[in-house]
Design a protein with these regions (language model features):
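Short, extreme N-terminal segment that most often corresponds to the first beta-strand
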Residues: 1-30
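Intrinsic-disorder/low-complexity signal
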Residues: 20-55
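Low-complexity intrinsically disordered segments
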Residues: 41-172, 176
Length: 185
């Protein structure tokens, strides 16, 4: 199962040209690749023109003399559904921030936006209202948010029975072996 992400290019104040990426959507993978290899507007535009991706890598163009698809990928070359798999209807689409923030039926976990200022920002999908984070800054400072921004804000929220919730949740877990967890109800 993949960690799905949106990769978007800001084109208006609340309009983003967006593609889907099926695999490796975590900030330390897709985020790092975007920050390091797609740090110029032209390069981001070329990436977005590929449309939806199977997975993102540092290079855009495969060697045309060699096979390149999800079964036989060329090293470090991005796999695009249309170009490399022959799929249709994979073009970039225009989305608003509200649309990017909705994980929808396909379970988008992270959203990456290349801003007008030429930097990559990200947020766990569904949590845009908690703010955006700078990909490069978080990678450089080892402050990447892998899960959710929720943990930064949960202490400021009024949670009734917060401790009881944790105890109730933990009581459903039975540890049968050191490496296995089994849920019981």
């Amino acid at each position: 199962m993949g960690t799905r992400s949106y990769i978007a290019l800001q084109i208006e104040e609340d309009e983003y040209l967006t593609i889907f990426c099926h695999y490796n959507g975590y900030p330390d993978d897709n985020g790092a690749i975007l920050a390091e290899h797609y740090d110029k507007q032209e390069k981001v535009e070329s990436l977005i023109q590929l449309g939806d991706l199977y997975f993102l890598r540092s290079k855009l163009e495969p060697n045309p003399d060699l096979p390149h698809n999800h079964s036989t990928p060329q090293p470090n070359v991005t796999i695009a559904y249309n170009r490399d798999e022959g799929w249709s209807d994979c073009e970039a689409v225009h989305k608003t921030l509200d649309e990017l923030n909705d994980p929808g039926e396909i379970g988008i976990e992270f959203t990456y936006i290349f801003t007008f200022e030429g930097r990559w920002i990200y947020f766990p999908t569904g949590e845009a209202e908690l703010g955006f984070r700078d990909v490069k800054e978080d990678l450089d400072n080892d402050t990447v948010q892998y899960d959710s921004f929720f943990t930064e804000h949960e202490n400021n929220m009024d949670w009734p029975d917060n401790g009881d919730f944790a105890l109730d949740t933990l009581s459903l877990i039975h540890i049968s072996e050191p490496t296995r967890l089994r849920c019981i109800s």
